[in-house]
Swiss-Prot record:
The gene is glnA2. SUPFAM superfamilies: Glutamine synthetase, N-terminal domain, Glutamine synthetase/guanido kinase. GO terms for biological process: glutamine biosynthetic process. Gene3D superfamilies: Glutamine synthetase, N-terminal domain, Glutamine synthetase/guanido kinase, catalytic domain. Residues 183-521 form the GS catalytic domain. Keywords: ATP-binding, Ligase, Nucleotide-binding. This is Type-1 glutamine synthetase 2. Belongs to the glutamine synthetase family. It holds the Pfam family Gln-synt_C. PANTHER family: GAMMA-GLUTAMYLPUTRESCINE SYNTHETASE (PTHR43785), TYPE-1 GLUTAMINE SYNTHETASE 2 (PTHR43785:SF12). It comes from Dictyostelium discoideum (Social amoeba). SMART domains: Gln-synt_C. Its EC number is 6.3.1.2.
Amino acid sequence: MNKLVNKNIFINKNNSLKNFVNNYSTKTNNNNNNIFNKNKNDLKSFSSSSKLNNNNNNNNKYEESKLMNAEDLILNQIKISKSPFVKIAGSDIDGILRGKYLDKSKFESSIKKGLGFCSVIFGWDSSDSAYDNVKFTGNHTGYPDMGARPDLSTFRTIPWEYDVPLFLMDFIGTNGEPLPICPRSTLKKVIKKCHEHQFDPVQGMEFEWYNYSENNKSLLNKNFSNLEPLSNGMFGYSLLRTSQNSEFMNSLAELQGFGVPLEGLHTETGPGVYEAAIRFSTALESADRAILFKHCTKEIASLQGIMASFMAKPFKDLPGCSGHMHQNFNCLKTGKNLFLDESDPNHMSDIFKSFVAGQLLLLPEFLPFFAPTINSYKRLVDGYWAPTTPTWGMDNRTVALRIIKGGKATRSEFRVTGSDVNPYISIAASFAAGLYGVINKLELKQKPIIGNSYDLYKKGLVERLPRSLAESTELLSKSKIAKEYLGEEFVDHFVETRRWEYRQFNHQVHKWELERYLEII
């Protein structure tokens, strides 16, 4: 008998969920790789994954489910899932997924009524230390609940966790509207602004990360030093190193069936460093995929005794980890790449040039969105293929914006971001900066940089990007454009969280200080 296993569902996000039912076409084979597929090439569609029960009796049930509306169809798949729970998750300000398990009945009620989450999710840092400087929540408010609502379009199941259903969620304010400081809602706000001008922001993300043969207990026992990398030596693009860790590589391939399709996966320069390229998609879907990739890579790695780290610069003498973003605007109506103009010597349209001009102009004051931690700025140093100036060039990896001529795939590579970013925030801010340039028809006055860009600021030809989180945060706090495009409440909250972050760092006595001063001063 044919086995029905729904491994990938492609849903057009511009359609209502009711249209979800009509998007199905089925295939069957004996390898449980049946695909329910709506135009894979449509960047307005996205993939999420789930499974239908394999019992033969369910063939008729599936035929009946076609008659259901989309919400009922998803709920039906939840009901026949073998898992008693559904997992829901949402992003905090640092890009960490916070969530919990719900039983099926509780999840079903949350679709209509929403559910409560303690507001401390936006009231503490990545170490769960409570902020003392944010307005949204704290002792002064009593840490009340805030609302949350699962986004049904993000439905997938977790292959390495007994196919537990998973949904991403948006946080909701007391007025029932999107919470202004929710990173995912902030990205939606920027996307809406783009759509108002008939621009569809699309992008693909790349991540580099370190892998160690460690776990959280061994990290503490070793005091975070003398860590054992998954493989020794530098060896970028090494087939030998990937084959030596083929079990881990094959486990990461499970992300394909999880709705996080990888275009490429290889070793990068550095001991135990890997890089993955996530398939191009719409801005929101790209952000969903990116945050799930980071979280789930950690889960998959831990099951094999590996600790995956997306810290931007773990060690001063080794390369940092990037989170590059490949971006362009498509026409919202036709899907045409609006960055391409083949009559231009660099194949750059006027829209593309203004987009780049906007990003270059706003990069210094928007920098905390792209370099959000103390450690981020240890990566942004000369000579390590990370930019230190607001510059652009054609296929130049020393600049902030690398322009890639690729016909219909013509795009920019935003190289400032490290792997420590919150994808929702970095994508929102980068497209907001580009959109500002396009709306205001900014002229791209800076010439493309040829060769080494690192010496330019030393010669006074361009400005140096801020060197610390403290410096960049104070620039951001004064940015009227950031508040206009991302929302004043979001920017004010984000600024205070970054002030808290560098204040915590400044209060510490570091090993370097002890080694330098303890004996000799």
